[in-house]
Amino acid sequence: MTIEKLAPSRRIFLAAALAFSLPLAAPAKAEKTETKVPLVELLAPQALPDVVEGKADAPVLIVEYASMTCSHCAAFHHDVYPTLKKDYIDTGKVRFILREFPLDERAAAAFMLARSLGDKRDAAIDFLFAQQRNWAFTETPFESLANAVKQLGIGQAKFEETLKDEKLQRAIYAVAEQGQKFGVNATPTFFINGVKFDGRMDVAGLPKIIEDAEKGAK
């Protein structure tokens, strides 16, 4: 069996595709919508446990739905996330959660591999976003992905074992299906204190978005 045939189960992927319409990339700049999800619903237990960054009592909660093959998502994590972490997450102003919303089998595979690393999931996601062009858009993406994750300590045996884990794959798509129930139909999508924003946030607009959310939380 070649590496390219080790893609996550096509049957499960197609079932997920039938369950919810596969989205496209969101607008390049974040746009506030009229949709608001109550925090008790947004923070309800997911099919996979949330990986939370920041203090539990932070006044602003940001939940991002992302795909590993979304270029806007990669740009956000490269250009904006470092500032978000330094100025807002690490200072106790923001609690941040990234949830899986794979656009395709390549993204699902990348999320599965990141989840296989336990508490190193977010570091793996940051790495794979940084390396996105080198694995996601090649002629042999799964072979390229296998080579990329070697730098994360994932050898060939673990790579193959992880991509055969149908329980994990179903859970990742269940997270995405729940996101769609919240109104997610493109990536990246952000919920900031429950208010839905479509598209990538930029550094310039970040202070006002968070300031407005803080005011609304008081």
Each model region followed by its residue ranges:
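Short capping/connector residues at structural and topological boundaries
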Residues: A56-A58, R106, D202
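Extracytoplasmic thiol/disulfide redox context detector
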Residues: T2-L6, L14-P102, Y173-A176, K215-K218
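C-terminal cap of thioredoxin/glutaredoxin-like
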Residues: T2-L6, I12, K29-K36, S67, ...
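Glycine-rich, flexible loop/turn motifs
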Residues: L39, L48-P49, A109, Q131, ...
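Compositionally biased, intrinsically disordered low-complexity regions used as flexible
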Residues: M1-T2, L113
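Structural alpha/beta surface segment adjacent to cysteine/selenocysteine redox centers
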Residues: A66-T69, A74-K150
